[in-house]
């Protein structure tokens, strides 16, 4: 599955004062694209996934050195996505070039190929080692202003968005849980190091009845960069990190 990524809509950031990153992973940013490290649900698995949640440990990330634009970004996130990758909702943290606040919360959703993604970045500077619950959940209630059902993105218990569409009947099924670190350039570091990994703990899947269960085994691996790695301590507990800095 081609999983699209959350740097596509950054216009709201253009008013920020650009500052150089404190350090750079590699001096040459190399290839631009969708580079992931982590796990995602195999579409062949026959259980229903209506939402995704995990407690994620924030880790800093060094950005590559020769692309001074806000398209130079490193992230870690949870996601619920359509099986064709055209629609998704996600929440996590991000560090992008030029952000004076460093690593911040972010959320994004996209209805599908019809529409642009809607992105929100926080202003709170996040410290390495802090933990937050990032979740996307399907709901049917008054929070859905434009449809019967919608997806809601949360950081801990704070609602960051309720989608303006109902993915039920629109998104290709089965929907997929994803837990990933990501960069837009192969020269950047995915968040986390071997001594301080980005941990995804208490990973959960939202079932058809709206209740939650621990993430099941049988996830597919993403491993786009030989400098990065990921591991697990159980089906519902995973880590990602940059294993080689050069």
Where on the chain are the PLM-derived regions?
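Hydrophobic helical h-region of N-terminal Sec-dependent signal peptides
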Residues: 8-14
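Bacterial N-terminal signal peptides that target proteins for export
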Residues: 1-8
């Amino acid at each position: 599955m081609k999983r699209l990524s959350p740097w596509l809509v950054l216009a709201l950031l253009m008013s920020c004062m650009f500052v150089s990153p404190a350090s750079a992973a590699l001096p040459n940013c190399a290839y631009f694209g969708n580079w992931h490290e982590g796990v995602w649900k195999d579409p062949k698995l026959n259980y229903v996934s209506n939402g995704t949640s995990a407690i994620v440990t924030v880790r800093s990330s060094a950005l590559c050195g020769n692309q001074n634009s806000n398209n130079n970004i490193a992230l870690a996130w949870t996601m619920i996505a359509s099986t064709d990758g055209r629609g998704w909702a996600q929440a996590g943290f991000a560090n992008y070039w030029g952000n004076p606040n460093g690593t911040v919360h972010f959320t994004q959703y996209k209805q599908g190929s019809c529409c642009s993604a809607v992105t929100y970045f926080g202003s709170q500077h996040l410290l390495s080692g802090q933990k937050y619950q990032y979740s996307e959940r399907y709901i049917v209630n008054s929070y859905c202003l434009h449809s019967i059902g919608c997806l809601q993105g949360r950081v801990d218990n704070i609602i960051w968005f309720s989608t303006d569409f109902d993915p039920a009947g629109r998104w290709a099924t089965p929907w997929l849980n994803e837990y990933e670190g990501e960069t837009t350039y192969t020269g950047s570091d995915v968040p986390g190091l071997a001594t301080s990994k980005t941990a995804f703990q208490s990973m959960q899947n939202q079932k058809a009845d709206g209740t939650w269960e621990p993430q099941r085994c049988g996830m597919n691996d993403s491993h786009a960069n030989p400098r990065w790695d990921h591991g697990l301590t159980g089906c519902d507990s995973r880590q990602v990190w940059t294993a080689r800095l050069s």
